[in-house]
């Protein structure tokens, strides 16, 4: 493949999203090594280049056709999308799928001594945020006027530093808010990581590679969400046992050697098999119950 036909994928340079993105690509069979001194990593076994950039640069790189794919948080993507709509600037991309990592929420938070009833409690106050567009959209929908304080980092210290009355920031556990004398009041946006693709014209070979990678991503996520279940069951309670298997579709039932009263059941379950379910299976006569992770799935 020529340089122009190499697939360019933008991922976050550092942080949790970077680690999870790299692990996902490696699980899809893309072999590469990261040199912390370099912003580009070349795959060893596929015509793929990984560009390691700041997360808020990824949507623009995809929308402008500089890269072909990007792995990004939906919050950052939505922030850029609103910005471009405001500026009447094109955003040529499609979201291929949501991923199973990068969960977070964008929330309003105020000092612990603040009496908060609803979002209208912030009328006319100053709110610090790194996501001015998402905040503005939410407040406009609520019909609330406010003053914003744009910060690129350390938003949670703004009230204590006298820069703002409240904040709008990403929350995971809430521990950072608590450490800074704040409490979460309202979630304005929930986010996961996602894969986006530029809609600018792709060569047939590059699009085929994108489709191939996406198929593998789908398989990896399906495998992570599934478990392989094996057990022995008496034929007289077979239907009841199959009905108990969570999310299982068409389990395989096999005869056991020298035992006409019992069968082996193999099933792929898309839900967790909890201890109480296993105890119910045992009560119905099931034995040798094994629940195993699945590394890869396809088809």
Curated annotation (Swiss-Prot):
Pfam families: HisG, HisG_C. Keywords: Amino-acid biosynthesis, ATP-binding, Cytoplasm, Glycosyltransferase, Histidine biosynthesis, Magnesium, Metal-binding, Nucleotide-binding, Transferase. Its cofactor is Mg(2+). InterPro entries: ATP-PRT_HisG_long, ATP_PRibTrfase_cat, ATP_PRibTrfase_CS, ATP_PRibTrfase_HisG, HisG_C, N-reg_PII-like_a/b, N-reg_PII/ATP_PRibTrfase_C. It is found in: Cytoplasm. Its EC number is 2.4.2.17. It catalyses: 1-(5-phospho-beta-D-ribosyl)-ATP + diphosphate = 5-phospho-alpha-D-ribose 1-diphosphate + ATP. It comes from the Bacteria. GO terms for molecular function: ATP binding; ATP phosphoribosyltransferase activity; magnesium ion binding. GO terms for cellular component: cytoplasm. One of its GO terms (biological process) is L-histidine biosynthetic process. The keyword Metal-binding applies. Feedback inhibited by histidine. Pathway: Amino-acid biosynthesis; L-histidine biosynthesis; L-histidine from 5-phospho-alpha-D-ribose 1-diphosphate: step 1/9. CDD domains: PBP2_HisGL2. It is an enzyme of class 2 (transferase). Belongs to the ATP phosphoribosyltransferase family. Long subfamily. Catalyzes the condensation of ATP and 5-phosphoribose 1-diphosphate to form N'-(5'-phosphoribosyl)-ATP (PR-ATP). Has a crucial role in the pathway because the rate of histidine biosynthesis seems to be controlled primarily by regulation of HisG enzymatic activity. This is ATP phosphoribosyltransferase. The lineage of its organism: Bacteria, Pseudomonadati, Pseudomonadota, Gammaproteobacteria, Alteromonadales.
């Amino acid at each position: 493949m020529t340089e122009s036909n190499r697939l360019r994928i933008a991922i976050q340079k550092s942080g949790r999203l970077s680690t999870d993105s790299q692990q996902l690509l490696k699980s899809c069979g893309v072999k590469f090594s990261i040199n912390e001194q370099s912003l580009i990593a070349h795959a060893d076994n596929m015509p793929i280049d990984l560009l390691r950039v700041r997360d808020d640069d990824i949507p623009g790189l995809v929308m402008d056709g500089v890269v072909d794919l990007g792995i990004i948080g939906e919050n950052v993507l939505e922030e850029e999308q609103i910005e471009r709509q405001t500026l009447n600037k094109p955003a040529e991309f499609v979201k291929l799928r949501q991923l199973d990592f990068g969960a977070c929420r964008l929330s309003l938070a105020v000092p612990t001594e603040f009496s908060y009833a609803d979002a209208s409690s912030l009328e006319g106050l100053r709110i610090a945020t790194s996501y001015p567009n998402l905040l503005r959209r939410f407040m406009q929908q609520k019909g609330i006027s406010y003053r914003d304080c744009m910060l690129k980092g350390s938003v949670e210290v703004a009230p204590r530093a006298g820069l703002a009355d409240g904040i709008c920031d990403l929350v995971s556990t809430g521990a950072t808010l608590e450490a800074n004398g704040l409490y979460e009041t309202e979630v304005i946006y929930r986010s996961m990581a996602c894969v986006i693709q530029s809609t600018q014209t792709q060569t047939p070979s590059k699009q085929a590679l994108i489709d191939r990678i996406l198929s593998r991503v789908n398989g990896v996520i399906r495998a992570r969400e599934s478990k392989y279940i094996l057990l022995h069951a008496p034929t007289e309670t077979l239907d009841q046992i199959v009905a108990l298997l969570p999310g299982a579709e068409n389990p395989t039932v096999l005869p056991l050697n020298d035992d006409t009263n019992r069968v082996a059941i193999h099933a792929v379950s898309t839900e967790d098999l909890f201890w109480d379910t296993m105890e119910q299976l045992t009560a119905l006569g099931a034995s040798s119950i094994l629940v195993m992770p699945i590394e890869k799935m396809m088809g």
